[in-house]
Amino acid sequence: MSKGSSTKKWLHEHTSDYYVIQANKLGYRSRASFKILEIQDKYQLFKPNMFVVDLGASPGGWSEQVIKYIGKNGKLIALDLLEMAPIAGVEFIQGDFSSDETYQKLNTLVNNQKIDCVISDMAPNLSGNKTSDQAKSIYLLELALDFANTNLNKNGSFVAKVFQGQGSDEYLKLVRESFNKVIQFKPKSSRAKSREFYVIATEFKG
C-alpha cells in the first residue's frame, strides 16, 4: 500500500470513528477525553482540591476533563512538546519533558508541593522503526515514573499510557515497586488494533 493510500485509509477510519464523532459532537478536544472519563468512572482517581500533573497533555483532552473533577480549588499543571490552547484553571508548559530546561520549569511550578496524581498520555514521535519507537516510549515512561516517585504524596496515584512490547513487562515491575496497587486497563475508547493500555497505579508507597 502506498503512503498516500495508507493516509487516506487512516483519515477514513479516523473520521468515521465513533469516539471522534462523539468528541466533535460534545465539543471535546480529542477522543482521548473518553479514555480519561472511563478511567475516572472505574477508579475514581480525581477529587475536589487535588493537585494533578498532566504529561503529554496536548491538545488537552485529559486536562479539560480532570479540571472539572478537581474544581477551582484544585491545581492542574499540563505539559507538552506541542502547543495547547488555554484551558481555564490549567497552567501549561510547552517543552520537551526529557530536557533539563523543561523539567526545571515544571519543578518551579510544582514549587515543592506534593502532587496527588501524575497522569501521562505521552508518546514519542513515531519513526516507523518499531524497536526504536518502543525504546523511546519506555524511556518517556521511565521519566514519568521518576517524576511521580519524586513528587507524589504518600498514597498518591499514577496513570500512564503503555504500549505492549519489549520492555513493557519490566516497566510494570518498576511501577509495582512504588505502588501497592497496579492494574492494567484498556479503555473501550482505545482503538481495537492499538497495542496501548493504561497502567493505573494507586497507593504510592512514598
From Swiss-Prot:
Keywords: Cytoplasm, Methyltransferase, rRNA processing, S-adenosyl-L-methionine, Transferase. The keyword Methyltransferase applies. The active site is at K161. Specifically methylates the uridine in position 2552 of 23S rRNA at the 2'-O position of the ribose in the fully assembled 50S ribosomal subunit. The keyword rRNA processing applies. S-adenosyl-L-methionine binds at G60, W62, D80, D96, D121. InterPro entries: RNA_methyltr_RlmE, RNA_MeTrfase_FtsJ_dom, rRNA-MeTfrase_E, SAM-dependent_MTases_sf. This is Ribosomal RNA large subunit methyltransferase E. Its main location: cytoplasm. One of its GO terms (cellular component) is cytoplasm. It is an enzyme of class 2 (transferase). GO terms for molecular function: rRNA (uridine-2'-O-)-methyltransferase activity. It catalyses: uridine(2552) in 23S rRNA + S-adenosyl-L-methionine = 2'-O-methyluridine(2552) in 23S rRNA + S-adenosyl-L-homocysteine + H(+). Its EC number is 2.1.1.166. Belongs to the class I-like SAM-binding methyltransferase superfamily. RNA methyltransferase RlmE family.
